[in-house]
UniProtKB/Swiss-Prot annotation:
Signal peptide: 1-17
Lipidation (N-palmitoyl cysteine): 18
Organism the protein comes from: Neisseria gonorrhoeae (strain ATCC 700825 / FA 1090)
Keyword terms: Cell outer membrane, Lipoprotein, Membrane, Palmitate, Repeat, Signal
Plastid found in the keyword field: no
Coiled-coil blocks: none
Lipidation (S-diacylglycerol cysteine): 18
Protein name as annotated: Outer membrane protein H.8
Recorded superkingdom: Bacteria
UniProt-annotated stretches for the region Disordered: 23-88
Intervals holding Sequence repeats: 23-27, 28-32, 33-37, 38-42, 43-47, 48-52, 53-57, 58-62, 63-67, 68-72, 73-77, 78-82, 83-87
Length: 88
């Protein structure tokens, strides 16, 4: 259940980011007016789900890079210490 809530949140963020909220409402309105487009509604949702899945790794990438940047920051003073001793 947590995964579905997380996926729904990502989907809503993706739709809000690309302005697709208005586009997502149009197929829903068509589906309610006739019975045939109801079969098309899941197909229309698939690209949005793929977009959310594509954005998930991009959102995780900065978090993965942050520890590497922190590690470089902590290693820099240690690397400077031998250089300072060599200069003496």
């Amino acid at each position: 259940m947590k995964k579905s809530l997380f996926a729904a949140a990502l989907l809503s963020l993706a739709l809000a980011a690309c302005g697709g909220e208005k586009a997502a409402e149009a197929p829903a309105a068509e589906a309610s007016s006739t019975e045939a487009p109801a079969a098309e509604a899941p197909a229309a949702e698939a690209p949005a789900a793929e977009a959310a899945a594509a954005e998930a790794p991009a959102a995780e990438a900065p978090a993965a890079e942050a520890p590497a940047a922190e590690a470089a920051a902590t290693e820099a003073p240690a690397a400077e210490a031998p250089a300072a001793e060599a200069a003496k």
